């Protein structure tokens, strides 16, 4: 019966190849003869029932390669676990380092915002107070101007009354001069009358009294006396009326002057008080202006400081986000590498299972008598193989327990 060859394909693990069986290889009743290539990464043919020294070395190399693959898989799994642990530690450390507690900063910002709001409210209250003070100052200024106008009117009235008083004084002096002249004239008339009476008495002397039945003579003395009494009464009445009128006018003027003086003093005291109030309000206004300027400066400094702090925090957040993106990229890359390694592991396990199945199937087909195999016929060419390789006629095939001890 012709011998049937079983071609096998083997490639390095880096190429992620699989071992497969050709469809032309069929099981045989004879002891198999095989052709195995000793070069790595090329096609090898394993024929049933044929083993030589090169084949043993090849099996040893395959065993070593499988052991190296398994060791490499375990090492890669170990390194992968270590890398995952390191990544987790670094991620947790960076999260703890790059995400500090900003609650204190937020609390400080809220407190400063409350202070700013309170300061704004205080500024508004101060502005309202200043406006009220300005309105009060305007009212006081209006009152002052009104009182000043009244004072000027009162002073004008007082000056007019003083002119009237001067005129009355002049009229009084004229009337007194007239009274004196009338008194002198009356005295002159009296002296003249007495002189005339004396002259008439001297002229009559011892003359006889001739009584004539006629109308009674006019008593000039009595008439003059009556006229004098009338004039004196008129003069006294006029003098008394003038004095009363003058006294009344003087009393009224004195009252007006006293009232005006009191009002003037009260106005002067009010003006002094208003000036003091205006000075106090101006001082308070300047103090409020300085306080407002200082508060505005403090507010500007606070806003600038917190703006810089917020910009720094924003830069920190940007850096943290960039680091997180880098970490995510690293994690994705390592995840891809891990998936590739898992794929390599799965392929290696599949390849190992294939080798194990091949070895077990060959072990079940090979007999335990090592040197009882006759010479085999030349191998027929198989599909998919470019050339036919023949093995020697006498081959010593190891038994199944020997192969199992190797693997």
Curated annotation (Swiss-Prot):
Residues 203-218 are annotated as: Linker 12. Residues 219-362 are annotated as: Coil 2. Gene3D superfamilies: 1.20.5.170, Single helix bin (1.20.5.500), Vasodilator-stimulated phosphoprotein (1.20.5.1160). Residues 91-101 are annotated as: Linker 1. GO terms for molecular function: structural molecule activity. The record marks 304 as: Stutter. Residues 56-90 are annotated as: Coil 1A. Keywords: Coiled coil, Intermediate filament, Keratin. Residues 102-202 are annotated as: Coil 1B. InterPro entries: IF_conserved, IF_rod_dom, Keratin_I. Cuticle of the hair shaft. The keyword Coiled coil applies. GO terms for cellular component: intermediate filament. Residues 55-366 form the IF rod domain. Residues 1-55 are annotated as: Head. Residues 363-407 are annotated as: Tail. There are two types of hair/microfibrillar keratin, I (acidic) and II (neutral to basic). Belongs to the intermediate filament family. This is Keratin, type I cuticular Ha2. It comes from Mus musculus. The lineage of its organism: Eukaryota, Metazoa, Chordata, Craniata, Vertebrata.
């Amino acid at each position: 019966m012709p011998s049937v060859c079983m071609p096998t394909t083997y490639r390095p693990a880096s190429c992620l190849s699989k071992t497969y069986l050709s469809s032309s290889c069929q099981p045989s009743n004879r002891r198999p003869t095989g052709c195995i290539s000793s070069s790595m990464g090329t096609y090898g043919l394993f024929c049933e029932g044929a083993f030589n020294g090169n084949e043993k070395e090849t099996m040893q190399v395959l065993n070593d390669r499988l052991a190296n693959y398994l060791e490499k898989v375990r090492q890669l799994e170990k390194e992968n676990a270590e890398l995952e642990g390191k990544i987790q530690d670094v991620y947790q450390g960076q999260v703890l380092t790059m995400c500090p507690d900003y609650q204190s900063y937020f609390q400080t910002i809220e407190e400063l915002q409350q202070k700013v709001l309170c300061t704004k409210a205080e500024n508004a209250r101060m502005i309202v107070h200043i406006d009220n003070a300005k309105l009060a100052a305007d009212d006081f200024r209006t009152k002052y101007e009104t009182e000043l106008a009244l004072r000027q009117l009162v002073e004008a009235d007082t000056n007019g009354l003083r002119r009237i008083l001067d005129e009355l004084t002049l009229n009084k002096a004229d009337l007194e001069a007239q009274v004196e002249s009338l008194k002198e004239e009356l005295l002159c008339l009296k002296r003249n009358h007495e002189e005339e009476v004396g002259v008439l008495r001297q002229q009559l002397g011892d003359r006889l009294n001739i009584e004539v039945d006629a109308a009674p003579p006019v008593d000039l003395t009595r008439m003059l006396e009556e006229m004098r009494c009338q004039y004196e009464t008129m003069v006294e009445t006029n003098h008394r009326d003038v004095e009363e009128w003058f006294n009344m006018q003087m009393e009224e003027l004195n009252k007006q002057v006293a009232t005006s003086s009191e009002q003037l003093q009260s106005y002067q005291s009010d003006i002094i008080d208003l000036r003091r109030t205006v000075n106090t309000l101006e001082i308070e206004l300047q103090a409020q202006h300085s306080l407002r300027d200082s508060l505005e400066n403090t507010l500007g400094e606070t806003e600038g400081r917190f703006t810089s702090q917020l910009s720094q925090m924003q830069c920190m957040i940007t850096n943290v986000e960039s680091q997180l993106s880098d970490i995510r990229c690293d994690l994705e890359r390592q995840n891809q590498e891990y998936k590739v390694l898992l794929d390599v592991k799965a392929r290696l396990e599949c390849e190992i299972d294939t080798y194990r199945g091949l070895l077990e199937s060959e072990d079940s087909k090979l007999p335990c008598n090592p040197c009882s195999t006759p010479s085999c016929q030349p191998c027929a060419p198989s599909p998919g193989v470019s050339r036919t390789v023949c093995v020697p006629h006498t081959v010593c095939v190891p038994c199944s327990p020997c192969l199992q001890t190797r693997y």
